[in-house]
Each structure stands twice: as C-alpha cells, then as structure tokens.
Amino acid sequence: MKFDEVVLGRRSCRGYLQKPVSRALLEEILGLAMRAPSSMNTQPWHFYVITGEPLNRIRRGNTERILAGEPDSREFRKGQPFAGAHRDRQVGVAKQLFAAMGIARDDKDGRQDWVLRGFRQFDAPVCVIITYDRVLDGSDDTPFDCGAVATALVNAAWSRGLGTVINSQGIMQSPVVREHAGIPDDQVIMKSIALGWPDETFPANAVVSERKSVEDAAVFVGFDG
C-alpha cells in the first residue's frame, strides 16, 4: 500500500472482528512505528500490548469503576476542556458517529452503551498502552514524541489491514490498567490504542471525520504567488 493510500484511507475503527492478531505481526508494526522521530533521539516510549484474559480484566475493571462513579484518574492530562472551534469539531464527529449508529439525541441507553464501548476498548482483540519514563514528566518534547510514535503505529497497522482508534477511555481508570498490565511506577500511562481486524459491517467504521483545508491551517511565508 502506498503512503498516500495509507494516510488518506486510514480511519478510526470502533468495531472489530473477534479474530486474533499474531504477536509476529504486532512486533512488525511496532518495529515500524519506532522509526518515528523523537527529540534528540530520546525515544521515551514504552508499549504494553495486551490481549486475552488480561485485557478482559481491564475491560471489566474499567466498566465497574465507571458505573460506580469513580472519577477520572488519568495520569497524563493537561489543559482545559475544549471550547470554540475545537469543541465544535468534537461535537461534529460525535454527531457523525451517532448518526451512523442510529443513536438518537434522547436515547440515553444507546448513548451510555456507546460510552461504555470506549471503556471496553471497543471490544478490540488487542489494546496497546503507551507510557513514557516518569523522569521525563513535564518535558515539552515527550508528549510530542509519543504522539509521533502513535501516529506511526496506527498508519503501520492500517497498511497491514488492521484498524485502530487512539483513545483516552481505556486509560481513564489508570490503576486498573497499571495493575493488570504490570506497568511499573517509574512510567507514566499516556494513551491507549484499540487494535484489531476491522468489522466492515459496523456502521461507525464507515465514518470519515472532516479535516480543515490546507488554506485554513497553513500560512506560507516568502513564496511567490
């Protein structure tokens, strides 16, 4: 698959076939992802690739704590809730997803079930947890580096026919993840990525989120014309 085809074709997948992904394929994808650039080649990332019963325990723990009203316990969280144009885009993609799934605005049960899917990692057969070394906590560069490797990972997965969705729901109850994935205290849990073979019959998987135009995002300085 050509690079342009990967970038233009990739989408976030929220429905998966219950079909295992081999360790060999996952190692190949991670090897490609880790060619991502990092500040001064620090390579701050670690990956916890989880499947089977350990992943099921995380799903159960996440769901139980959320339903019990436990507060968000993410270890990496900066900034304020989205507002303005950023909030508009967040709401826009939510509307696309709800429309695809046939979930009405007043369908409280349907909306709750959709939210809980996220805490179950969208029932994907694999979850990848990205962490970084705690000694780098507060670094300006480390979040950027982890974002770069996550982007490389999801593109590498797509090029092999695998779907992904980068998400925060899977790590919102970080104590559960840390316990069942065996993550040491000297690492900070940053992000989760659900991964597996896409279920092409799952309506939300057909959603293509909108993007700003180059004209809206880029300023060209010193060019003629």
Regions found by a protein language model. Give the residues of each.
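Acidic, surface-exposed loops and disordered segments
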Residues: M1-G225
